[in-house]
From Swiss-Prot:
Localization, UniProt: Membrane
Membrane topology: Single-pass membrane protein
Origin superkingdom: Eukaryota
Primary localization class, coarse: membrane
Record-annotated membrane-spanning stretches: 81-101
Organism: Schizosaccharomyces pombe (strain 972 / ATCC 24843) (Fission yeast)
GO annotation, cellular component aspect: membrane
Keyword Membrane found: yes
Keywords from the UniProt entry: Membrane, Transmembrane, Transmembrane helix
Name of the featured protein: Putative uncharacterized protein C12C2.14c
Length: 111
């Protein structure tokens, strides 16, 4: 029994506070954020976005089930604040840079 618990703990090693499963979900979340901001490349086809949202829903369900198993409560959320802030602010920063370049820098180059 101890060996089984040891293997379970060894398998769930984290890297900078992010487990392997969360690292595998990062690219999906980034793609979903970009698509929800700018629209999908194939805007007429909703199946692609629906499949990504279903995958992300499964990811979220798995995270919630992992949190219930751990039972740490609010301490668990502290390490996700940075990622949540990044995912929320990334599209706004990108759009802000785009409009800054479009309105401020490009008119000077056209003169």
């Amino acid at each position: 029994m101890e060996e089984l618990q040891y293997n379970f703990k060894k398998r769930r090693k984290t890297h900078n506070g992010i487990s392997r499963f969360q690292r595998s979900a990062l690219p999906l979340t980034i793609v979903y954020t970009i698509w929800s901001t700018f629209g999908s490349p194939c805007s007429g086809d909703q199946r692609v976005t629906l499949s990504i949202t279903s995958i992300l829903r499964k990811v979220q369900d798995r995270r919630e089930s992992e949190k219930k198993v751990k039972g740490k409560g609010r301490e668990e959320y502290r390490r996700y604040y940075f990622f949540l802030l990044f995912y929320v602010s990334f599209p706004h920063i990108f759009l802000g840079l785009f409009f800054f370049i479009d309105k401020k820098i490009l008119p000077f180059q056209s003169v």
